A protein has these predicted regions:
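Conserved, well-ordered alpha-helix/loop/beta-strand core segments that scaffold catalytic motifs
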Residues: 187-205
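Short acidic, glycine/proline-enriched helix-loop-strand junctions
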Residues: 15-16, 20-22, 33-35, 212-227
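Receiver (REC) domain switch/active-site residues of two-component response regulators
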Residues: 2, 60, 201
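Glycan-binding loop/region signatures in secreted carbohydrate-active enzymes
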Residues: 113, 120-193, 220, 224-227
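C-terminal functional modules
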Residues: 206-208, 212
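Short acidic, glycine-rich surface-loop motifs adjacent to enzyme active sites
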Residues: 3-10
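Substrate-binding surface in catalytic domains of secreted glycosidases
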Residues: 13-146
């Protein structure tokens, strides 16, 4: 093996923050020579148990998981409304996460260690012809399913300049209409450019076998242009 990747999520509080860095430094010291230590971190807006500066000192690579911002539930009061703004990676939130990770006082000091993780989650809603919510269930179509829907001639794709995320409107075989937020070539390249603005040139992809590379939905080829 080449090394270890640590992905502990949901960490909160000063005690955990201190103990986690101690654990990582001890782990790094225990690894055989030449083995790498990668550490995944979450945005500290909600998860306060990540000491970015300390983690950066212990790790060979720090991977920022600034994704999956979509809703986890929908209030019943939203049914019948057009409130479906649930982008998976709203640009302002990703910006805030990158800013905090690279903060001169508390962030990772060596920016060459940093990578922005790109994930390919989705958030879909069952809507009527006026885009009103018919139910409060959130659907999560896989990239392979989205590729098929995006290839349909009647599918509409709208790119939100506010969120820098696309949403697709499509109809299934039974006549049901869905609105789905997801990642596409443009949204991924926008985040790559944003990361570069902070001096971050590394990208991490979640996960192998889940990266869209279809004719109508080809993020992989777009990423290769940034090498």
């Amino acid at each position: 093996y080449a090394g270890i990747t640590i992905d502990f999520e949901g960490l909160k509080g000063d005690t955990i923050k201190q103990n986690y860095v101690t654990f990582l430094k001890e782990l790094d010291a225990a690894l055989p020579q030449g083995k790498t230590l990668y550490v995944c971190v979450q945005p500290d807006t909600w998860y306060t148990g990540f000491d970015y500066r300390g983690i950066g000192e212990a790790a060979d690579k720090v991977i920022l998981m600034a994704h999956d911002y979509q809703w986890t539930s929908v209030p019943d009061s939203y049914a019948g409304t057009t409130n479906t703004d649930s982008p998976v990676t709203p640009f302002a939130s990703v910006y805030e996460a990158l800013r905090d990770l690279t903060d001169p006082a508390t962030g990772v000091a060596d920016r060459s260690k940093l990578a922005l993780q790109i994930s390919f989650g989705s958030a879909g809603f069952h809507v009527d012809g006026e885009d009103r919510l018919l139910e409060t269930t959130i659907y999560h179509p896989a990239p392979s399913t989205l590729a098929l829907r995006l290839a349909q001639p009647d599918t509409q794709v709208v790119y939100s300049e506010e969120f820098r995320n696309p949403c697709a409107l499509y109809t299934t075989e039974d006549g049901s209409r869905y609105k789905v937020w997801y990642e596409n070539e443009q949204s991924v390249l926008d985040k790559v450019a944003l990361a570069r603005m902070f001096g971050i040139t590394g990208v991490s992809l979640w996960r192998i076998g889940n990266i869209p590379a279809d004719g109508a939905y080809d993020v992989w080829s777009a990423l290769l242009t940034q090498r």
